[in-house]
Amino acid sequence: MAALFLKRLTLQTVKSENSCIRCFGKHILQKTAPAQLSPIASAPRLSFLIHAKAFSTAEDTQNEGKKTKKNKTAFSNVGRKISQRVIHLFDEKGNDLGNMHRANVIRLMDERDLRLVQRNTSTEPAEYQLMTGLQILQERQRLREMEKANPKTGPTLRKELILSSNIGQHDLDTKTKQIQQWIKKKHLVQITIKKGKNVDVSENEMEEIFHQILQTMPGIATFSSRPQAVQGGKALMCVLRAFSKNEEKAYKETQETQERDTLNKDHGNDKESNVLHQ
């Protein structure tokens, strides 16, 4: 009996220990769970801060871009928004008024009914000028005319064309029209003429094709590089380019001179014939 009692007591003790372990283990997990989740919970806050900073940076970049565009705007009326405390001022006649506080500048603008325009912001202090509305309008028109007179030219493109020495006249006319379009767009045109198969043709005959093409564009195009042998003498190559403005002007003057000489010569011949008839 005693042995049976001890056995039951031992089993009951083991069950109690297991129950306590489960109970305390569950309690420990409940306590430690929030501590484990706290770094995860703080993550959104960190993400939010980073996002806010990134958004602010992008906004600053956009503002800087807007400021740069405003600074690049040609000849604009500043108005009363003078960023510098002291500026170097010129009046509407171009007279140097020296350094002046912006409050005095605004007062002068009101007294004379003038506008304020930036002249040079890279100096210290920055240079500004008082101008009338009409002066600003005239200056803008002058700047636009200067831009039209000196347009910004992009990089020169090179077009390439390969012809055969035995090309037909119809095909040559078609290719010549294409070359003329490229020349009008100020492109360089590289032309290569290869010797046709089973055709005995001299370099002079091939070079004559280049001159035939060039003669269709008098006063418009000329050789950038003259015809020369390439590919071991199997082909000739040249580069055509458009006339420069000075070349166009010189060509027109030459043509006008020749026309005047021709008219004078014809007029002189008419006089001689009239004298003979008399």
UniProtKB/Swiss-Prot annotation:
GO terms for cellular component: mitochondrion. It is found in: Mitochondrion. One of its GO terms (biological process) is mitochondrial translational initiation. SUPFAM superfamilies: Translation initiation factor IF3, C-terminal domain (SSF55200), Translation initiation factor IF3, N-terminal domain (SSF54364). InterPro entries: T_IF-3_C_sf, T_IF-3_N_sf, Translation_initiation_fac_3, Translation_initiation_fac_3_N. Keywords: Initiation factor, Mitochondrion, Protein biosynthesis, Transit peptide. The keyword Manganese does not apply. Residues 1-31 form a transit peptide. Its main location: mitochondrion. Residues 249-278 are annotated as: Disordered. GO terms for molecular function: ribosomal small subunit binding; ribosome binding; translation factor activity, RNA binding; translation initiation factor activity. IF-3 binds to the 28S ribosomal subunit and shifts the equilibrium between 55S ribosomes and their 39S and 28S subunits in favor of the free subunits, thus enhancing the availability of 28S subunits on which protein synthesis initiation begins. Belongs to the IF-3 family. This is Translation initiation factor IF-3, mitochondrial. It comes from Homo sapiens (Human). The gene is MTIF3.
